[in-house]
């Protein structure tokens, strides 16, 4: 078992990954750890507030490094202003780590088999599929036959008070231009 056994090879991989990939691994991990708590991600202002850090060059460089290395994506939630850009964690290993390994107190080599039909694993599969789509928008557009069309990628959700909500995980908004 590569994740859940006592000496599993990937048990400490999360920390090693950040230490080897980034100059300031603890700072970067704090951002990723926060983004791992909410599938829709957070705005820049929300990240700064929740982590109680200042806006500046270190934060900006950290976001750029995470974007460039495909750990996160930046998107504009449908129906909101351009100022409400969200940053969303899409790295598959990091998402898996946050859902299943981060708070794991014990080792259980049969974890996956014993939890295969659990609600937690079912929810994670949905999030994982959504993130695969978000990470491969160009391939999705090609499969849909719209690879040459200018688009914007977004997500949308609506949750009225005291009611169940509605959510669309991936919107591909087409920009069609007419020339006169």
Question: Where does each model-flagged region fall?
Answer:
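Active-site beta-strand-loop-beta-strand hairpin of nuclease catalytic cores
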Residues: 172-180
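Accessory nucleic acid-recognition modules appended to NTPase machines
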Residues: 2-170
């Amino acid at each position: 078992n590569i994740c859940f056994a006592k000496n599993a090879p990937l048990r400490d991989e999360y920390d090693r990954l950040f230490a080897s990939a980034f100059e300031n691994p603890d700072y970067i991990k704090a951002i990723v750890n926060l983004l791992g708590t909410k599938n829709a991600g957070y705005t820049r202002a929300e990240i700064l507030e929740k982590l109680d850090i200042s806006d500046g060059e270190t934060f900006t460089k950290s976001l750029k490094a995470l974007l460039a290395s495909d750990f996160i994506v930046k998107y504009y939630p449908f129906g909101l202003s351009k100022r409400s850009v969200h940053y969303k964690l899409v790295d598959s290993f990091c998402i898996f780590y946050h859902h299943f390994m981060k708070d794991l107190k014990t080792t259980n080599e049969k974890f996956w088999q014993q939890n295969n039909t659990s609600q937690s694993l079912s929810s994670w599969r949905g999030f994982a599929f959504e993130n695969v789509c978000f990470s491969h928008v160009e391939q999705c557009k090609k499969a849909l036959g719209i690879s040459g069309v200018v688009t914007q990628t977004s997500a949308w959700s609506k949750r009225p008070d005291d009611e169940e909500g509605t959510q669309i995980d991936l919107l591909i908004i087409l920009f069609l231009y007419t020339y006169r």
